[in-house]
Amino acid sequence: MNCDLQQISKLKSKLGEGIFFDGSAVYWVDIESKRIFSSNKEFNVILDFIPSVILSKIKNRLLVGANKGIYSISPQTIEQEITFENIFDSSEYRLNDGCLLRDGSYLLGFMHQKTHNRKIGGIFHVSKNKNITLLDWNCKIPNTFIE
């Protein structure tokens, strides 16, 4: 990886989360400023949605978990398109973290947007066929999923 750490340290985030390494670049989101940053200094984009986590990079497109679903973003054109919405349809909750599993399904954790220290959140499994299963509804801030 050709990475300029001094350049990366200049990229300031208010609430940086969701780090992802694709083998050549590091990507992360800033939830508060609705941005994606990258160690590739040419890809720093402001989004139309609130990002939470970079789930994967498939066919040169980033899969980004966000408040309204999963988005696909082209680092080359900065085109943003939603690929799956209404996983958990609630204006009070947002996707906080997740991962793409080897079988093409997702584990996704949702938390309350405003009172996450008092209200519980949940973990969902979303199959390749987009079947949604609630696995657990007993964690306040579901975080760090690793297969």
Regions found by a protein language model. Give the residues of each.
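Residue position within the beta-strands of beta-propeller blades
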Residues: Y27-D30, V64, L107-F110
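Short, solvent-exposed loop/turn segments at conserved positions within beta-propeller repeat blades
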Residues: I31-E32, K114-G121
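A short loop-to-beta-strand structural motif that recurs across blades of beta-propeller domains
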Residues: R35-F37, G69, G121-F124
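Glycine/small-residue-rich loop that forms an oxyanion/phosphate-binding "nest" at active or ligand-binding sites
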Residues: L62-L101, F110-N117
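Short loop/turn segments that connect beta-strands within beta-propeller blades
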Residues: S39-E42, S74-I78, V126-K130
